Amino acid sequence: MKRILLISAVILLFINISLAQEKFPSIIPFDEKKLTSDIMTPEVLWSFGRITEMSVAPDGKSIVYGVRYFNIQMNKGQTDFFKINTDGTNKMRLTGSSDAKFGVKWRPDGKRIGYVSNRSGIMQAWEMKPDGSDLRQMSYISDGISEFKYSPDGKKVLYLREVKIDKTVHDIYNDLPKSNARIIDDLMYRHWDEWEDGLYSHIFISDYISENIKDGIDINAGEGWDIPMKPFGGIEQINWSSDSKKIVYATKKMRGKEYAVSTNSEVYVYDLSTKATENISEGMMGFEFAPVCSPDGQYIAWTSMERDGYESDKTRIFIYNTSTKEKVYATKDFDQNADGLEWSKDSKSIYFVSGIRATQEIFRYDLAD
């Protein structure tokens, strides 16, 4: 009987995989390109895959990463995920389908890999085993999500979702359902190639139970600004504390013309137990960005520009002591930008990236200095 059940389960698994492949067939032939010349033609350039993102396994032994390929004839691109050991061995492809997918990340226990995909029709969270098998949908959130991040203890998930705050022309004139007009009476009504549509990205917190994400709590309820900030902001602007009890994020809590002309964003800490939000960068008038918590919970570091309205200011590192509430300008004597902050495991150093002599290099700042 057990053998019959096992065989049935295997058959169902292969049926599910086959159906998924039929629904989202790969548009990229994953064969090795054989170059017959050292001339870099447009066709050769477009045949190369572009690495999009990566995540290191909790045990530090392997890396999962995304590669985007393009099909010139179909004028389409396809992203797939790969895994490789940190010593460069055992490379394997985990996915091979044309559904939109991004945000690949390891679960804190290292047993599964999560990402966002539109495989179900809208963007939702999915998980698979480290070998690419046992793909499962994790979330069934109304209207979908745009990203998510596991808490360090693996018990909760924060996810991002668009929330309607402002009224649109259809709300005001419900007798004109087919109208495509926009009512504009203030800035900021458009950012580059994107219209302001009355929807704002908010942070939701959900329990993560039995590998499922439930409808979460909106910690920014009623707020008419985006978290993360547009146009460049991503999930890196939002991070968990090491004890999974707090969330740090950066945003610009302004509206209208003030939002359009100011770059004065702030760093906020949200406490899950008290549901209170604290501004820890108050008095800093420039662009505060991408806060990260130290593993020991003692510090929060972020990048900062000094002056409001000046988008080309030097990007500095500030470190906030969660006990004393003091802030330190860490890179005061470093005459370059600093980005991509990462704490060392012992919380004694911060690694960051800076451009020097037309190259991007990795630097380290030691707190003891």
Over which residues does each language-model region extend?
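Bacterial Sec-dependent N-terminal signal peptides
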Residues: 1-25
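Mature N-terminal segment immediately following signal peptide/propeptide cleavage
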Residues: 29-68
